[in-house]
Structure formats: C-alpha cells, structure tokens
Amino acid sequence: MKLTCVLIIAVLILTACQFIAADNTEYRKWRRSGTSTGMRLGSRDCGPWCWGQNKCCPDESCRSLHESCT
C-alpha cells in the first residue's frame, strides 16, 4: 500500500515537472514571436525589455503607453 502511494506521488511529480517545462518552452516561443503587449504595438525589434506598460514605437524605441511615438 505504501509503495503504491509512493509510485502515485512520483508519477504526479514527474507529470507536473513535464507541464512546467512545456509551459516555459511555450512562454519563450510566445516572447520571441512578438505577441507580448509592448512588442505587439510596434516593431518587433525593441527587445525583450519593452513590455507591460510600455510600447514599441516604429523607430524601435521603447516608450510608456501614455507617451506618443515621435
């Protein structure tokens, strides 16, 4: 009975680890594709730091959402 419980817990832990690894891979692909909030608003060449409350302007500069692109 104890062995069965240990095996079930081990399988659950391994399954959780696989899901975490898969989620991290999908997140990296999503970030590289330019679909994050900041990069979606302009050029994809602003870099990974331009996201959240920022936007990427056509001249590849990262600005606040409240600033206009000049």
Swiss-Prot record:
Places the protein is found: Secreted
Keywords: Disulfide bond, Gamma-carboxyglutamic acid, Hydroxylation, Ion channel impairing toxin, Knottin, Neurotoxin, Secreted, Signal, Toxin
One cellular component (GO) term of this entry: extracellular region
Modified residues (4-hydroxyproline): P48, P58
Disulfide bonds: C46-C57, C50-C62, C56-C69
Proregion span(s): 23-43
Family: Belongs to the conotoxin O1 superfamily.
Protein name: Conotoxin Cal6.11
Species of the source: Californiconus californicus (California cone)
